[in-house]
Amino acid sequence: MLSPALLKVSLNRRSSAPVPQDEKMMFHSRNRAASYLQPMIEDQELIGFNRDRRRSSGSIIVDSFELGNASPSRRGSIASGIPMDKKTRRKLSNPVSLHQYTEDPTLAWEMLKEKRPVKPVRQMRLDTPVKPDHVRFVCIGCTHGEQFDISKLPPGDVLLVAGDFTSCGLPNEVHNFNKLLGKLKYSYKVVIGGNHECTFDDTFLKLKQESEPKEMALKQALLSAIHSDSKGGISAKDLLSNAIYLEDNVIELFGITIYGTPWQPKVDNWAFNLSRGQQLLDKWNLIPAGVDVLLTHTPPLGHGDMMNNGQRMGCAELLNTVFKRVRPKYHVFGHIHEGYGCTTDGYTKFINCCMCNENLDLKNEPVIFDIPVHPHTKQFYIQNVKKIHKRFQKKK
């Protein structure tokens, strides 16, 4: 019930037939030894451009550090972890409406694909040096509690984890993952939950609706594990002491804003499941326009969301939110293991960073990308890791 075999049953219920060959060409081979994004022309612009873009259209940054004439230590607060309350939420300039075929993502994509370009992204080599005036992001997701060789993770500044780092969110799984994070040399590790982090979803264990026997058994086992492992009321989220956990909120690191959210279309009554349509759109409406990096568990429709049977699993409202309103430079996600790879719509880079393939085997490489910053900004954030972590926890 709590073994990987259970998870494989759930995954196999959603995939069967092979992907058409022409659709496969939209993604890079999983067997390639390189998974680094080659910066496109617009990546050479300084991150200050995005900062100005946010200022001019309603800033989402509150009490944040910005490099200026004064030294960083004298320019106000050193970081900002900003819950998306009414005061900090940006008014929607381009409201996204529900797609008429949102319940059928494969059909919805057939209607949208002419106006939503998808192109493969050229990738950099794994041994590309980290530059002093760039922030290196390393993206992983969907490890499902599997042990992997941390020595094979490339160097970088920020680790992004796109959810599903456990098989079902058992406290000992979270503890082991947190212990692994503590061994990594990244200055910051930013984590979101996925549908398998059942103990992270406050509503998952409280559901009273009728469930299948295996689902009820899973919930009972989780409740028992939480009760036996709880120490002073500490939640599973609190066990991630070596990471910055985001759930519908944003943090600024190196002057770069990162927004994280775990929700995804409902499949088999797992954690952070919501019905397609208005329920999910309400969550996407919380994402501020102008964030630099969007970290979700689910893919948007059309990017890294195709299963082996040719069906699409992405969210149409998330795609339209990204394309029409938020416009991040990078959108990082996981969830659909068969969709591993990188694409672009000409502005946003979409990264499906699932480490496990559809058989839950760790076959895929991490994916990295760089964002240029001022060297002094990078140095400041590297030197003040503990202070910035402490400030974020206080904001939460």
From Swiss-Prot:
* Region feature Disordered, mapped onto this chain: 73-94
The GO terms describing molecular function are: hydrolase activity
Under the heading Gene3D superfamilies, the entry gives: 3.60.21.10
Which InterPro entries does the record match to this protein? Answer: Calcineurin-like_PHP_ApaH, Metallo-depent_PP-like, UPF0046_metallophosphoest
What is a single Pfam family found in this protein's UniProt entry?
Answer: Metallophos
Family assignment from sequence similarity? Belongs to the UPF0046 family.
Q: What is this protein called?
A: UPF0046 protein T07D4.2
